[in-house]
Amino acid sequence: QLPETIEKSEFKTIADLGKERLRRVIKEIKVLIQAQKEKEAATIFGDSDKYKLDLGFKVFKLSKSNFKIWDSTLEKEPEVIQAKLFEHIQHISPEAEQEAILYELLLKSGFELTTPIEKLTLAGLTVFSIAEGQLLICLEKELTHDCIKAMAEMQPTRVICLDEGFKGENADALKTNAVQIMKSKGVVNFRTV
């Protein structure tokens, strides 16, 4: 929702009005659930698990990318190109939060914001499973062979890892092995950002 202003209202924008309406509905649902739980608690066969609902919502705002964008209009001078290359070694904004990077990659991969995301722990590292394992995203800054192997064994269609996750003196070997491990398990698209 664009931040369209509202005249003659206690809310500044339509988005603010929508958020308040959602909050009120959630509050009403919680009251109804509590009343039903109390009613069922009086019976022997009360089942409170059926009332476990996700009653939250997220608000997304359009903002600049978390990734630096390459300027293709650069002069052809080798010194200028070299300077720009060094600037892009660290191409993720230092202020970027993990959740913001995750959702940006989700959108850039063609998924909707409502796509189910599951947080997994593979070989001690956090990996996000998108759309029931179609896409795995690992935003860890120190990848391990075991984590790469565990992701590949899940046989997703696509895997995205941070380029900076491949660190140390064996970084190139780990990245090369990651590509081969993914291919051997049928992962169609493995890339780093």
Residue map of PLM features:
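Accessory, often C-terminal, charged low-complexity segments
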Residues: 1-193
